[in-house]
Amino acid sequence: MAFDDAALERALRAETKHGLTLYCNGETLTALGYEWMAVVPMDGLRERLRGTLGALVEMLGYIPENDTVRIVRNKGGYLVQPELPETVGEEICGYAGETHTEEIRPTGLRMWMNFLMQKRNGDIVGVTTRGPGLDVRRYSITPGGIVRQEDGDTGERLYRRGYRPREDTDSEATLRKWRHLEVMSWCDWDAPEE
């Protein structure tokens, strides 16, 4: 369960190409990538996610404790720039700030680069596969379209931005495909979650 160490390590390294933001308050480490955010308790990082911790030490030169930094890969190494915690806090709130959520489940379908998930009301939401995976089967979605995965045992959380086509920006063909998918129920809501 929880984060796969190798997947999280790969995701962190990949994000440094454009800039990875880390926020550590001593208890949890929050990593902000492009359209995803991962929250890992520090004790889990030290005990279980050794590869991820090794990657962070390689990038920073030390184990993060109470830091807010942006890491960008440059020639021959990494450039680490301090960030204001308030600025990063606003971005974190954009993902985690909404308390009202509703259940959502994977459909097993993909469209373009998104894997598709469905709410109980039939709405289909596309979620990018970029970033680390979290091996849990309990998902929820906020009104703002943030898909949240949580592992209650370890306290690890992954947030991804959901995608829904918009009438003002997406083509009629895309909207038609989406509507066609939404008329069918792709999830067995009566089956217990694994």
Predicted features and spans:
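C-terminal functional regions that serve as terminal interaction/effector modules
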Residues: 26-28, 32-37, 41-194
